[in-house]
Amino acid sequence: MRSTELVHWFRQSTPYVNMHRGKTFVIMLDGDTIACPNFVNIINDISLLHSLGIKLVLVFGARYQINELLQQHQIESVYHKNIRITDLTSLELVKQAVGKLNYDIASRLSLRLPHSPLIDVVSGNFVLAQPIGVDDGIDYQLSGKIRRINTESIQQQLDRDAIVLIGPIAPSVTGESFNLPFEEIASQLAIKLKAEKLIGFSATQGILDENNQTISDLLPQDAELYLAKLIQQNQYHSSQARFLQAAIEACRFGIKRSHLISYEEDGSLLQELFTRDGVGTQLSMEHSETIRLATVSDIPALLELIRPLEQQGILVKRSREQLEMEINQYTIIDRDGVIIACAALNCYADEKMAEMACVAVHPDYRNSSRGDILLEAIQKRAKQLGIEKLFVLTTRTVHWFQERGFQLAEIADLPDKKRQHYNYQRRSKILIQALQNKKG
């Protein structure tokens, strides 16, 4: 990374460093993640998160390692409703795998980053289990479910700056040990601790669409469809499916954001948390982007967005004072507090016409659908105001508007006031669209 790129990244990440400090993250580390060569870098990045003041609870699974041990001992796993039935013989091997992973993860976290204090990693009986029991005549034996979580003790450890490490084996009140689904532990911990985020890993960079492109944002209902598809493809135990189960459940109970990233790509965790767009899939209760009317406090960001386009001659120059007077006319797209697009609606009520003006989209988002989203928002607002015709003046984007139903027009077609102030030097093309107002 060149020095200029480093400076840019560092400046961009600063708001997120401040935003995340003091918050609680629950991080899911399944057996596949732990087994991958990049895991040492993931651990280093987790240590870095801790050094930035983020409270961390690590929940690890061991399915990959357990399966290896069972195969070595020629023991075949039996499942019912996608849950492994754990007998006494299997449980001893499960304990062996989980115990080794617990020690290995704690040891790696204890390796200090240069010039950083020693990290305190704490494990304990924070989760109490109970047997699943018998279902459809099938005895789950030593496969269990959560009975209780000692959130007070976990919070005490987090408050004293320790990382809490929890595996999939938990004791019961009778002293027995039970094998629990680690995704259930992760989701319930996130819910009980009111975590800011739930984070998981998979082989791919999040959830992929039919073109193998990462889906950056998912709503719970969309996530449920992807989970159903994975189950239909017999991938119930995949990293993606287990994350989605945990994230959907967590979202139902108020965890606003969960993230799925690649365990194979170095730095994914940091890129997801400290850049505006991340690199993986975010499951949230609502989209990270909102469309809203601008306020006076948005003016500095609006100026920053439109200035480059003004300098290129694409937009007419507007002063801060003009923006202040016209701020109520602006619709913006807000992404995590950053304005990435804007457009103004200037109404000429007597002629029932309005101009869509000052259309600007941040360079990082110009090859996306933000322009269409803005246009739809402006059209909707214009209809609400009783506008029958929407027009634009443009020097560069004639075809874009024509593709969306605008027709080339003449100066004479403009409202009287706009016609009087038409800039003949710019020679802007005029396009008009008739709005179809629904009559109730």
Curated annotation (Swiss-Prot):
Single GO term (MF): L-glutamate N-acetyltransferase activity
Broad EC category: transferase
Superkingdom of the source species: Bacteria
GO cellular component terms, semicolon-separated: cytoplasm
UniProt keyword annotation of Repeat present: no
Principal location listed in the UniProt entry: cytoplasm
Annotated N-acetyltransferase domain residues: 289-429
UniProt EC number: 2.3.1.1
GO annotation terms (biological process): L-arginine biosynthetic process
Reaction(s) catalysed by this chain's protein: L-glutamate + acetyl-CoA = N-acetyl-L-glutamate + CoA + H(+)
Localisation: Cytoplasm
CDD domains referenced in this protein's UniProt entry, alphabetically: AAK_NAGS-ABP, NAT_SF
Annotated pathway: Amino-acid biosynthesis; L-arginine biosynthesis; N(2)-acetyl-L-ornithine from L-glutamate: step 1/4
Disulfide topology: none
Acyltransferase listed as a keyword: yes
Key words of the record: Acyltransferase, Amino-acid biosynthesis, Arginine biosynthesis, Cytoplasm, Transferase
NCBIfam families assigned to the protein according to its UniProt record, in alphabetical order: N-Ac-Glu-synth, PRK05279.1
Protein family: Belongs to the acetyltransferase family. ArgA subfamily.
Name of the protein described by the UniProt record: Amino-acid acetyltransferase
Gene coding for it: argA
